[in-house]
């Protein structure tokens, strides 16, 4: 168990994955302040982890969305599948993928998206999302898209 590894000093902190709010609370109770992250799926197409994101924000636990662009087979079509993301991207002259990551970062200070990439240009595009500041009305429009 994680608590045994923590208590033995084998690891300093722990994270969990694919957890619901009850499981996050239970892990926090068992591990105390040593639970530092929750990794759940979260993207424009998959927002059912919103309660977990909100709980992590409340508890100060990092929330790491996996497949933040909707998965490798859906990332390229993100703009066509979610018009609001394409519209905001066009307004900023950036990719819909960059807008998606910036939107996720804007959800809460605890959000750390973990996009995958095999091409240098998409890695650079993802990194640029940290500098893309979305206006409140853009965030509202993106929140509403696909909700």
What are the roles of these predicted feature ranges?
Residues 1-147:
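Beta/alpha (TIM)-barrel catalytic core signal, keyed to glycine-rich beta->alpha loops juxtaposed to Asp/Glu
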């Amino acid at each position: 168990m994680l608590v045994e590894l923590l208590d033995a000093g084998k690891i300093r902190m722990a994270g969990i994955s694919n957890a619901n709010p009850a499981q996050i609370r239970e892990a926090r109770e068992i591990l105390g302040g040593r639970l530092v992250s929750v990794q759940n799926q979260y993207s424009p197409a998959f927002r059912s982890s919103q309660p977990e994101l909100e709980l992590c924000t409340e508890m100060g636990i990092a929330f790491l969305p996996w497949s933040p662009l909707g998965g490798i087979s859906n990332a390229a079509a993100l703009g066509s599948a979610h018009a609001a993301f394409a519209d905001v991207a066009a307004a900023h002259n950036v990719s819909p993928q960059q807008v998606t990551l910036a939107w996720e970062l804007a959800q809460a200070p605890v959000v750390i998206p973990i996009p995958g990439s095999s091409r240098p240009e998409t890695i650079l595009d993802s990194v640029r999302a940290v500098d893309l500041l979305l206006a409140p009305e853009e965030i509202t429009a993106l929140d509403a898209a696909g909700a």
